Amino acid sequence: MSKPEIRALRMKMGFVFQGYNLFRNMTALQNVMEGLTTARKIPEAEAKKRAREVLDKVGMSDRENFYPDQLSGGQQQRVAIARAIAYNPEVILFDEPTSALDPEMVGEVLEIMKELAESGMTMIVVTHEMGFAKNVATRVMFIDEKVIMEENEPQEFFAHPKNARLREFLSKVN
């Protein structure tokens, strides 16, 4: 792929990192606006309006003027999700979005992700949250040592795993 093709593809994707990757010197609102104004060249007033809409969607409208160090891990991850959905991507990639969270915060982030899935958002999620995968995913893959060991619909994947390594894994996490 050429560099312009790669850039065009990236413009269709959102990405939520496990470590949030928020700019520490920017408020929640500014963090969401940054990609809109810098990469998308959206006028500031329009970017601010859109940023406020998505912060509201993830339950963070009351924290728009807070800096990352003033937010809990779950709140930071919700800002990261707002940033990812701000420009209406075709797909969002989630890299273990709950792994850096306190157990109490995991549920609120998973609930937002579930709402995104229910709204029709295509998501590729790397996760160890098997209950979430079982209840929300339309396809589940088990990858071990960089190899796809099994792929199936959630019910079949969890009820009748064909791969021995997957059966071993599921026996340890269930």
Q: Model features per residue range: what roles?
A:
Residues 1-154:
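ABC family nucleotide-binding domain
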Residues 144-145, 151, 155-174:
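C-terminal boundary and immediately downstream tail of ABC-type ATPase nucleotide-binding domains
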